[in-house]
């Protein structure tokens, strides 16, 4: 008995942390000692009236409940009152602070986590009384068909919920008909579409065309890395001109637009402003003249010769396919570029300077520290299995294309990588006088030089999405988004790791020491451009990588119908070793090149416009 009394006394003397239910932040610390349970104050706590003792300060209330063994205390009439009272009051403060730039995204998502978990706890009690809460409006949000990227969508979803919007998140790769039917069935106020890859722009255009065809007039918000106000004005607005389509650049802006749309007068005024902006952009686009003229494709091809007379392509030490399975997280950490991580969270600066920014620096350090905890856990529990695959094949340039072979004699063709060439005339301020195509950095047969062509695909592991969904199911959006952000960094680190291994060991054409900052600054020979990005903006070329490397069979990565990679934390690309190879921006191409490319690919007019329309602008 003495031992139990001592244990109780020790427990009482330990600090008890009282958490404010609305914000989930520590507001008081109480050190309870034996003296707290003696004297007049304690005697008063023997009161039997629930109405009286429930009005005491929270510290006194806790003391009384602890001694009396009371596990329930009602200070508000119903669970719904708790949600719509202190919880929503707290989130209103969060929304206001975020909108005013006084609170940063990681803080908002953490507050949303407390809100979600609190509501999840209260929901069974609310359901028992058949109570339903009010909201500022109902929003259906989705990443469009063919696209798997959803970090930005998830952030918008969380911030919307922080502002008391009911959000129906349909996830990724959602067809237009499912979004529309859900919006109708749920009597939605607003639809929000997200997309990262350029084919998603076509899907958004199709979606708005369907909305018009069906006679629907719900406001539609557009967002994502590949979207812009200019594209919305020129391509999307005409598809939904009689209704409302809004481009929103970030989560804060999305909330502002949604809040305004829920007020009929505000909605009309906002749409008028957007229409004026769109029509101004359209007029400017129609009247614009190119700063430099476009060359014919034949003129553009009369340029870079590769300087093959003075250059001998390095012979790989190893050719064929090389697999990398379960690369240790500890190894990949050395290759991480942290700067893009902060941009995901809306924080300023590059690593490590972001920590010293007067606005957001402290929060940048906190979220970075949280990321280190995630990496530590991944190192220990091995729940992610980063994998990659690369291949090196004999190759030669044929015009703007790279033809690949299975044999050193270059007689057995196994595939062709089709290239696009810059057509805009080079100006005096251009980095190079040449109109580049990536095939320029591969020797043709006439040069007499033997050349090779490399390709790769990497992902952090197909297990990532299961872990993310687990956090979401637990109402923990913060760790879900944090894991996705870390996963993206690991995927890029994996790509950097393979490229380093290729240069120094597998192809073995350079002798270099590991230097992470040097890798970030690309202080090495060779490049790894990706299909779908500025130098090679045509996404269907990923199929060649998948076919030759057997990517899906070997490491589980997949391509969607829009050629987005699954899982989202994935990277693929080509390897070039020529010392003059560089990452250039293709820019606008003209119809003569588009038709020539389509002919080489075996496309009809429809396919040409689908996959090259963005490059043709």
Curated annotation (Swiss-Prot):
Methylcob(III)alamin binds at residues 84, 146-150, 194, 198, 251. Keywords: Cobalt, Metal-binding, Repeat, S-adenosyl-L-methionine. Pfam families: B12-binding (PF02310), B12-binding_2 (PF02607), Met_synt_B12 (PF02965). Residues 33-134 form the B12-binding N-terminal domain. PROSITE patterns: ADOMET_ACTIVATION, B12_BINDING, B12_BINDING_NTER. Residues 136-272 form the B12-binding domain. S-adenosyl-L-methionine binds at residues 337, 528, 583-584. GO terms for molecular function: cobalamin binding; metal ion binding; methionine synthase activity. Residues 288-617 form the AdoMet activation domain. Belongs to the vitamin-B12 dependent methionine synthase family. This is Uncharacterized protein HI_1042. It comes from Haemophilus influenzae (strain ATCC 51907 / DSM 11121 / KW20 / Rd).
């Amino acid at each position: 008995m003495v031992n139990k009394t001592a244990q109780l006394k020790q427990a009482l003397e330990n600090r008890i942390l009282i958490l404010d239910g609305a914000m989930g932040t520590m507001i008081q610390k109480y050190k309870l000692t034996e003296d707290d349970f003696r004297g007049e104050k304690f005697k008063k706590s023997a009161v039997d009236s629930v109405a009286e003792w429930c009005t005491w300060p929270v510290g006194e209330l806790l003391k009384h409940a602890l001694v009396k063994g009371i596990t329930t205390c009602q200070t508000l009439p119903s669970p719904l009152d708790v949600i719509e009272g202190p919880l929503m009051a707290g989130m209103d403060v969060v929304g206001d602070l975020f909108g005013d730039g006084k609170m940063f995204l990681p803080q908002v998502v953490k507050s949303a986590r407390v809100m979600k978990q609190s509501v999840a706890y209260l929901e069974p009690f609310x359901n028992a009384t058949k109570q339903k809460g009010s909201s500022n409006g109902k929003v259906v949000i989705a990443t469009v068909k063919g696209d798997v990227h959803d970090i930005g969508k998830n952030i918008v979803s969380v911030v919307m919920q922080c502002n008391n919007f009911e959000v129906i998140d349909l996830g990724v790769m959602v067809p237009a008909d499912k979004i529309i039917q859900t919006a109708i069935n749920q009597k939605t106020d607003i639809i929000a579409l997200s997309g990262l890859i350029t084919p998603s722009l076509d899907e958004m255009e199709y979606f708005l065309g369907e909305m018009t065809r069906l006679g629907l007039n719900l406001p539609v918000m557009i967002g994502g890395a590949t979207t812009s106000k200019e594209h919305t004005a020129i391509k999307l607005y005409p598809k939904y001109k009689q209704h409302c389509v809004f481009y929103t650049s970030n989560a804060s802006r999305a909330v502002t637009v949604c809040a305004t749309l829920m007020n009929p007068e505000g909605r009309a005024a906002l749409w008028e402003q957007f229409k004026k902006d769109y029509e101004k952009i359209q007029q400017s686009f129609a009247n614009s003249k190119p700063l430099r003229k476009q060359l014919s494709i034949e003129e553009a091809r009369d340029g870079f010769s590769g300087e093959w007379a003075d250059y001998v392509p390095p012979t790989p030490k190893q050719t064929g396919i090389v697999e990398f399975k379960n690369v240790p997280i500890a190894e990949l950490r050395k290759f991480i570029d942290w700067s893009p991580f902060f941009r995901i969270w809306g924080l300023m600066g590059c690593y490590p300077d972001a920590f010293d920014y007067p606005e957001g620096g402290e929060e940048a350090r906190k979220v970075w520290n949280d990321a280190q905890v995630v990496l530590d856990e991944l190192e220990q529990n091995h729940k992610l299995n980063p994998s990659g695959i690369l291949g090196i094949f004999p190759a030669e340039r044929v015009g703007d294309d790279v033809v690949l072979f299975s044999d050193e004699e270059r007689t057995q063709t196994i595939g062709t990588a089709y290239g696009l060439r810059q057509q805009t005339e080079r100006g005096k301020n251009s980095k190079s006088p040449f109109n580049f195509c990536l095939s320029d950095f591969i020797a043709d047969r006439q040069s007499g030089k033997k050349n090779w062509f490399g390709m790769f695909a990497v992902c952090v592991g197909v297990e990532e999405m299961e872990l993310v969904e687990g956090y979401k199911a637990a109402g923990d959006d913060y760790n879900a988004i944090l894991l996705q952000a870390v996963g993206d960094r690991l995927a890029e680190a994996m790509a950097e790791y393979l490229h380093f291994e290729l240069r120094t060991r597998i192809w073995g054409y350079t002798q270099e020491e590991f230097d992470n900052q040097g890798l970030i600054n690309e202080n090495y020979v060779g490049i790894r451009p990706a299909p779908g990005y500025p130098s090679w903006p045509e996404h269907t070329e990923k199929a060649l990588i998948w076919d030759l490397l057997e990517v899906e069979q070997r490491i589980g990565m997949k391509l969607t119908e829009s050629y987005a990679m699954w899982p989202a934390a994935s990277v693929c690309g080509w390897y070039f070793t020529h010392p003059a190879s560089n990452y250039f921006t293709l820019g606008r191409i003209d119809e003569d090149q588009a038709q020539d490319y389509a002919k080489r690919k075996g496309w009809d007019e429809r396919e040409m416009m689908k996959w090259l329309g963005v490059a043709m602008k």
